[in-house]
Every structure is written in C-alpha cells, then in structure tokens.
From Swiss-Prot:
Top-level taxon in the UniProt lineage: Eukaryota
Disulphides: none
UniProt-recorded Gene Ontology molecular function terms: sugar transmembrane transporter activity
Protein name: Sugar transporter ERD6-like 11
Organism: Arabidopsis thaliana
C-alpha cells in the first residue's frame, strides 16, 4: 500500500513537472500567431508617424492650411475613438480573428484613399477610416496575444505590439522625407494585406471560445498553441471554470465594471491611457518635423536618426518586461519622459533668451531622443499590455472599450491642440508635458499592480478578490 502511494506521488510529481515544462513551451504556432497579429500594429505605427514626414508635401500639393492639416492629423484619433467604441463588442461577436479582418478592411481602405486623394475630403475620409482600423487594432491585438501566450512570456509577446508600432513609425520617419507621400500610403497598407492572408493560418483565442461555450474547440486551439503532444486539459479546465464563474457572478451588463471589486482595475486602465496620451506622445510623433524646424535642426537628418534610434529602445522593453516586471519599466519611463520634456522646455526658453544659440538645435534633438527612448520601453506599450491582463472576461468588453476610448479621445485632444499650443509657447508646451510625467510617476507608484508571472485567471482573481 505504501509502495502504491509512493508510486502515485512520483507519477503525480512527474506529471506536474511535465505540465510546468509544457506551460513554458513556446511553439511555432504562438510565434506565428503573434507575428500575424502585430502586422497591423506596424501599419498603426506608419499611420502615427505619417503626418510628420508628409506635412510639407501634402500642404503644398493639396493647398491645405495649418488648421486643415492639424485636423487631418487628428482625424486618426477621431476614427480611433469610433473604432475603440465598437472594438470590444466586435471582438466578442466576431471573435478575435475576424475582428482582425475588420481592422484590415478599414486600414487598407484608409491608406488607399489617402494615396489617391485629389482633395481634402478623400484625405480626411481615408484618415478617419484608418483611425477606425487602428482603433480596433489597439484593443484586439494585445487582447488576442495575451490570451494565447504562456504566462512567462506574455508580457514580452504582448509588448511586441509596441515594437512593431515603433518599427512602423521608424520606417515612415526614415523614408518619409525622401519617398513621395502617396507611395508611403501604399506601403502602409501592405502589412494589413499580409495579415489578411496570415489570419487563415492562426487559431482563435481559447478564452473567447470558452466564453461562447465551445469546449472541444478550446482544447483544439490550445493543442495548436501548446503543441499536439501537450496535455492541455488542466489549462483548458482552468480557463473554462474561471470564465463560467465570472459570468455566473455577473451578467456582464455595462454597469458591472463600476462594481467596487473592479474599481481599481478600471482606474488603473483609464489612468494609464491618460498618462500615455497627455504626456504629449501623439503630438510630438505627428509633428516632430515642426519641432526640429523650430529648434533649427535638420528635418531630414532628425527624422532619419529618430527612425534608427527608437527600435532598439522598444527592444529593451520587450526583453525586460518579463524579467523586471511592468512597474519598474513604467516608473523609469515616466521619470525619463518628464526629464526629457523638461529639458526640451529649458532649451526653447534659452533659445528665446538667445543663450547658446549654436547648441540649442542639438540639445532639443538629443532630449527628444531621450523622451522617445523612455516612452518606447515603458509608457508607449505597457498600458496596453496591462489593459489586456487586468480585466476579467465578463467585463473585458465594456472596460476595454472605455479604456481604449479614453486613449483615443485624449490622443485626439493632444494631436489637434499640439500645433496651436506649440505656436503659443514652445517651452510652455513641454513644461506641461514634464508636469504630466511627474504626476504619472506618483500614479504608477501608488496604484498600478505588478502583473508578471501570473496566469490571467490568477491575476484577475487577486485583483478582484475572487477565489
């Protein structure tokens, strides 16, 4: 009897060891699925950086005023808000994969409308359509990646979304000043066309399948993601039990997310998006050439160096997010962005006083690199990583929609107001951004939880007090 018990214990121990090893396995399917999902993020980055390099050429060819071009730039955020409003519901009704197809439709139409625009109407329509597409992307891509990846690499894989966005921005910055703006719009559509094809070869999210009660499909999806020879019964059971428990606990009405147990997650999600946008990132990204021009730095040289610089910084975040955790990177990012903004403001103050005029262009440019380097490894992408992790499945639609909508509406405000603020006071604009960075540090320190190393079910249970 004792021998049988010992044998059983050994078998259970070996099985647990095997399951732990399987949980840490990264399959080709996970890599392919993540790559396909982030193709549209590359297009998103192209859209974000597009107005900077194309500003002079578009305004000249289509005879646009500064107000018209500012509106064109900000319409990406207007469309993004519309896309964000419907993103969660679409992801539930259609599933994650088919929602990605919807993203591709809006993005390809938007890029081609811009590429062949003969007047401001088609230009703006294309920008709005592109915005709707990237508004959907901003929700569904990080959610899909978080739902398919093993917990020990979830942060890095989800952060690859930001890496591809930065790569898109870099491409536009590097080539935008030397390639015709219409050709660049066509190039921006290519990743979405590739994604449209790639979606045929990737599995649906097992957590979405669990939500719609497709038990066999949950295991089938997990087998593709974890390996055919892997025992996925434990993970499948955990996903289905947690999903069922949450849905029984709440009927998933819009008001559910305002329950006391979800209050912290909602405040964290909304707060991080406000930090990301009100720190000035959209305005600086959209109109960086105007900043270079004001500082007296070469627009072409500045854009090309920026394009090379930003990708390695995003890679730092990708490598460290599952080693150091989300909080340390967010805190370091907030400090660095605040210092960078402060020093840019000081530079423009010295320029106005005609102090060290020969050094001001270099000083402004270096601190823009500091700002964006710190943005890239932290606040640029980690708010979306955390958003994809902290909301339980029963409120993920409503809460995720509100959080994404917050990002896009605040981004619209910054992107539209930036040119007018910059004309009012270059230094004042960056002092405001520096103050936001300082407040961001306090917010992150006091409220943002560490999410690394936990399954989505474990994390959400700890945040909401569900056992």
């Amino acid at each position: 009897m004792v021998v049988e018990e010992e044998n059983r214990s050994m078998e259970e121990g070996l099985l647990q060891h095997q399951n732990d090893r399987d949980d840490r396995r990264i399959t080709a399917c996970v890599i392919l699925s993540t790559f396909v999902a982030v193709c549209s993020a590359f297009s998103y980055g192209c859209a974000a950086g597009y107005t900077s390099g194309a500003e002079t050429a578009i305004m000249k060819e289509l005879d646009l005023s500064m107000a018209q071009f500012s509106a064109f730039g900000s319409f990406l955020n207007v469309g993004g808000a519309v896309g964000a409003l419907f993103s969660g519901q679409l992801a539930v009704i259609l599933g994650r994969r088919r929602t990605l197809w919807a993203c591709d439709f809006f993005c390809v139409f938007g890029w081609l409308s811009i590429a062949f625009a003969k007047n401001v109407f088609w230009l703006d329509l294309g920008r709005i359509s592109l915005g709707i597409g990237v508004g959907l992307i901003s929700y569904v891509v990080p959610v899909y990646i978080a739902e398919i990846t093993p917990k020990h690499v979830r942060g890095a894989f989800t952060a690859s979304n930001q890496l591809l966005q930065n790569s898109g921005v870099s491409l536009i910055y590097f080539f935008g000043t030397v390639i015709n703006w219409r050709v660049m719009a066509v190039i921006g559509a290519i990743p979405c066309i590739l994604q449209t094809i790639g979606i045929f070869f990737i599995p649906e999210s097992p957590r979405w399948l669990a939500k719609i009660r497709l038990s066999k499909e949950v295991e089938s999806s997990l087998h593709r993601l974890r390996g055919k020879d892997t025992d996925v019964s434990g993970e499948a059971a955990e996903i289905q039990v947690m999903t069922k428990m949450l849905e029984e606990d709440s009927k998933s009405s819009f008001s559910d997310m305002f329950q006391k147990k979800y209050r912290r997650t909602l405040v964290v999600g909304i707060g991080l998006m406000l930090i990301q946008q009100l720190s000035g990132a959209s305005g600086i990204t959209y109109y960086s050439n105007a900043i270079f021009r004001k500082a007296g730095f070469s627009e072409r040289l500045g854009s090309m160096i920026f394009g090379v610089f930003v990708i390695p910084k995003a890679l730092v975040g990708l490598i460290l997010v599952d080693r150091w955790g989300r909080r340390p990177l967010l805190l370091a990012s907030a400090v660095g962005m605040s210092i960078g903004s402060l020093l840019i403001g000081v530079s423009f103050t010295l320029q106005q006083m005609n102090v060290l005029p020969e050094l001001i262009p270099i000083f402004v440019f270096v601190n823009i690199l500091v700002y964006f380097g710190c943005f890239a490894f932290g606040i640029g992408g980690l708010p979306w990583v955390i958003m994809s992790e902290i909301f339980p499945i029963n409120i993920k639609v409503s809460a995720g929609t509100i959080v994404a909508l917050t990002s896009w509406t605040s981004g619209w405000f910054v992107s539209y107001a930036f040119n007018f603020m910059f004309e009012w006071s270059a230094q004042g604009t960056f002092y405001i951004f520096a103050a936001v960075g300082g407040m961001s540090f306090i917010f992150i320190w006091m409220l943002v939880p560490e999410t690394k190393g936990q399954s989505l079910e474990e994390l959400q249970a700890s945040l909401t007090g569900t056992s």
